Amino acid sequence: MIAVVQRVTKSSVEVDGKVVGEIRKGVNILLGVAEDDTEEDINKLVNKIVYLRMFEDEDKKMNYSLLDINGEALIISQFTLLANLKKGRRPSFEYAAKPDKAKALYEKFVEEFSKYVKVQTGIFGADMKVYILNDGPVTFILDSKQL
């Protein structure tokens, strides 16, 4: 499971021209589910992200977590994070979970994350427009297999 976590001042997602999710200060999470992912991967990522000290204190040091600042999360499913780009010029998605499995694990990730902070989401499988006002910019790429 791969998560691109961006510290944001605000972020929103639109589907068919309508805002379906919007947050203020917090994180935007683009989440890719791999074929071999399990609930253990969810637990590792959720625990890492909610406690990751990525928000600045008064001295401009990253000492505060999402929980410390009472931040929010916008979570977007993005299977393209699992693209294999080794051959040719067209990405292969052989490592991405099939839609049914990906949706189930994505929804479980959202459910677990919601136990800690306010969460908004996009719509799984929809064509979305994601607006991200990255703060810093501060961006982390986390792979659950490396945590």
Curated annotation (Swiss-Prot):
The entry describes its oligomerization and partners as: Homodimer.
Alphabetical GO CC annotations of the entry are: cytoplasm
Q: Does the keyword Ligase apply?
A: no
Protein name, UniProt field: D-aminoacyl-tRNA deacylase
Question: Regarding domains, what does the record say?
Answer: A Gly-cisPro motif from one monomer fits into the active site of the other monomer to allow specific chiral rejection of L-amino acids.
Organism of derivation: Sulfurihydrogenibium sp. (strain YO3AOP1)
**Taxonomy-wise, where does this protein's organism fall, top ranks first?**
Bacteria, Pseudomonadati, Aquificota, Aquificia, Aquificales
Q: Name one GO biological process term.
A: D-amino acid catabolic process
**Which family is this sequence assigned to?**
Belongs to the DTD family.
Function summary: An aminoacyl-tRNA editing enzyme that deacylates mischarged D-aminoacyl-tRNAs. Also deacylates mischarged glycyl-tRNA(Ala), protecting cells against glycine mischarging by AlaRS. Acts via tRNA-based rather than protein-based catalysis; rejects L-amino acids rather than detecting D-amino acids in the active site. By recycling D-aminoacyl-tRNA to D-amino acids and free tRNA molecules, this enzyme counteracts the toxicity associated with the formation of D-aminoacyl-tRNA entities in vivo and helps enforce protein L-homochirality.
User: Quick one: where is this thing mainly located?
Assistant: cytoplasm
The signal peptide here is none
The record's listing under Pfam families reads: Tyr_Deacylase
Gene3D superfamilies named in the record:
D-tyrosyl-tRNA(Tyr) deacylase (3.50.80.10)
